[in-house]
Amino acid sequence: MKNRVFIFLLASSGLLASCNFLEVDKYFDEQLTLEKVFSSKTYTEQWLRNTYSYMNYVVDVSSREGTIENFADDLCFNDFGETSILGDAEEYGTFLTVAYDESYRQTTWTYCWQGINKACTFLQHIDSNVAYSDADRADLKAQARFVRAYYYWALLKKYGPIPLLPEEGPDYGLSYDELSIPRRPYWECADYIADEFAKAAVDLPLKRDGTNIARPTRGAALGYRAKVLLYAASPLMNGNNDSYAARLVDDQGNRLISAEYDERRWALAAAAALDVMDLNVYELVHSPVRTVSMGRKYPKTVKPFADGEFSTMNWPDGYADIDPFESYRSVFNGSESASTNSELLFTRGKNGNNGWDASEQYDKNFSIEKMVADLLPKSAQGRNRISMTQKQCDAYYMYDGKDVPGKDSEIGGGDGSVRPGIISDSEASDLSFAPALGEDASVRKGISKQYANREPRFYASVAYNGRVWGRGSEVYTESKPITYYQSWYYRNSDNGKKNGYEFPLTGIGFMKYVHPDDSQQGDASAIVAKVEPALRYADILLCYAEALNELQTSYTVPSYDGRKMHQLSRSQDELERGVHPVRIRAGLPDWPDAAYENRDLFREKLKRERQIEFVGECQRYYDLRRWKDAEKEYTKPIYGCNMNIPLSGSSETEKEKYRILFHTPVEVPNVPAVFVDKSYFWPFSKTELKRNKRLTQNPGWNIYD
C-alpha cells in the first residue's frame, strides 16, 4: 500500500498556518509515493491541509446556495421566479416540498468521504515521519482524527446511519463488490464518532494561538462529542417505534434506529457536555454597559428588566454590568475575531470572502458574507431576500420575559390577546417608550408596537419594518448627507414588493450577521469579515440542560479520559447551570420555579430557547427532526406581514389604516406548509447506491433496484 503511487495535490501557497488556512488556492500535480510524502514535513503538512480543505464545503452558516437547510420554519428565502447560480429554478420551494430527487445537493457526501479517506491515510502513515517530535506528531494525529470524526458526524447528522470504514481506510486494490460495506446502526455510528472525538481530545491543546485559531482544540473535540451523543439520545434515534424507523434498515433487514428507549444515552450526553464545561476555558461573549450613545450604530445600553435578581448582580451572576444587545450581536457580526470570541469552540476562521459577486467561483456560496449580501436591503445594494417567519418573530420574549401580545394567534396558539397597534406621534416622542427601537423619535414613529419592548436578541436579529441599518462603511458627502437608513417594506417602497424577487417574503427581515458598517453601496462599501460560529459554548450549556432534564434516576459516567466520574441527576441547580448564562447574556429574567420542577414544561421552554438563540445557525432544521417535532411545526402555515399593502393615504389617519393592514399577519403565498417524512434524512444518490451494493436507501426515496 505504501508504495502505491498517488496523485497528491499540493498547495503552492504556504502551509497550514493562518486562521483562513482552509483556502486551498492553487494546486499542481506531482507524482509522489506515500513513503516520500510522509518522510517530508512539508508534504505531510500539505496532506493534512488538503484533508482540512473539504470543510469549506460542509458549513452550517451560509445562504441558500451553500446551506439550504439553514431555512427551516424560522427563515424564508425568496427565489420565486429566479434561476439560481446552481441552475435550480425556484429552488427554495422545491426544497420545502421535498420535490427534489436523489441527486440533489450531494456536496456533503462527496467532500466528507474525500476528507475521511485523506485522514485515514494520514493516520496510517504519520508515525513513519521521524522529522517530528513525539508531541508534535501526537498533535497532528489528533487533528487528523478530529477532522475524520467531524466528517463522519456531518454525514451522520444529514444522512442518518452510514457505513464506517476500517481504521486503515479502503483498500483500493479490491473490486467495488468487495469494497461494499453496509450501513451501521445509528447508535454504533454515534458511539464510534464520540470515541474518536474523545481520543482526539486527549492530545489536542486547550488553546491555539492566533495563527492557528482554526485548528481544533480539546474543547472543539469534546464539544462535538457532546453534540453527537445528544442527537443519539434524542427521540428520532432513541426508542423510535414509528413506521419511518421501522423502514430504516440495512441490507439484511436489521433496524438502524433503536426501538428500545435507553435513558442512559441522555446521561452520556450530559456528561459529555460537562466535560467541556469543566475545562473552564469558555464563557459567553459579554460586552460592558455603554453609558453614552455613540450614534445609531452603537446606542446607549438599554437597561434590561429589573427582575430583582439578575438585575442586581454583575456578570456572570447577573446582567447589571453588561449590554445584552451588544453582547449577543457581536458574536456574529464580525466585531469579535476568532481569537477574541470566548464562546467559540470551533470555527473555520473567516468563512468565505469579503464581499460576493455572482460571477465569482461557486465555493464563495459557502460563506457568511454571501448570506449577508442576501439579507441586506436594496438600499444598501443587498439582495433583500432572506426573511423571518411570524412564528420565529413571535418566539422572542418581551423585555420582561413575557410573551408578545397576539403570539401565534394565527396558527392556533397564544393566550387570546391581540396584536398591538402602531406607535403614534406622541408615543414616538416619549423617550422612555421603546428605546431599543431607536434613540430618536423620528425613527420610532409608525413602527408596529409588536416590535417594541422586546428582548435584546430580537433587536440583534430582527429587521422589522422601519428598522434602521447602520451602513457605516459608506462615504458621506455634502451631496449625500445621509447618516442612517430606515428600511420600510411596504409595497412599492424601495425594499418592499416592487419588482422581481428581491424582497423579504414575510416583510420581516433578518440581520443577525449584519455589522453596523456593512453595505454594498458605493466604492468604499464593504461587508465586515465574519467568523463562522460553527460550535458555540451556548450550545453546550443548553445541551447539558436538555440532556439532564430527561434523567429520571441518577447515573455515574466517566469523563472522556477516564480520570474522573461524573455524578449526574436532574436537579434545579444543575439545570440552572446550563440555562442561566444564556438567559443572563440575553438580558432576560429567569424562568419560574415551575419550569424547573416540571420536566415537560422545561423541555418546552428549552426548545424555545434554542429556537431563539440559534436562529440562522442551521440548528433548527436538525433540532425539529431529532425531537420529532418537524411534522407538527412544518405543517403550520407560514405567516408574515401583508406585502401587498402600500403606505397610502393623504392623511395620517388614512396611513394609520394601511400600517395596521400591513402588520396584520397573513399567510405567505408560495411558501407551502408541508412535511414529508422522507426528509428526516437526506437521500443517497443513484450513483452511490450502484457503487456500494450493500448501501440501503433512506425510506421514501428511490432505491434504483
Descriptions of predicted regions:
Residues 41, 45-49, 53-58, 63, ...:
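Conserved, well-structured interaction surfaces
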Residues 19-69, 292, 437, 449-452, ...:
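Membrane-proximal, proline-rich intrinsically disordered regions
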Residues 1-29:
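Bacterial Sec-dependent N-terminal signal peptides
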Residues 18-21, 112-115, 192-194, 277-278, ...:
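Long, intrinsically disordered, low-complexity segments
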Residues 348, 356-468:
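Segments forming glycine/polar-rich beta-alpha architectures that bind adenosine-containing cofactors
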Residues 156-157, 163, 228-240, 550-554:
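Short coil/turn linking the two alpha-helices of tandem helical-hairpin repeats
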Residues 172, 179-186, 236-271, 531-536, ...:
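Acidic, serine/threonine/proline-rich low-complexity intrinsically disordered regions
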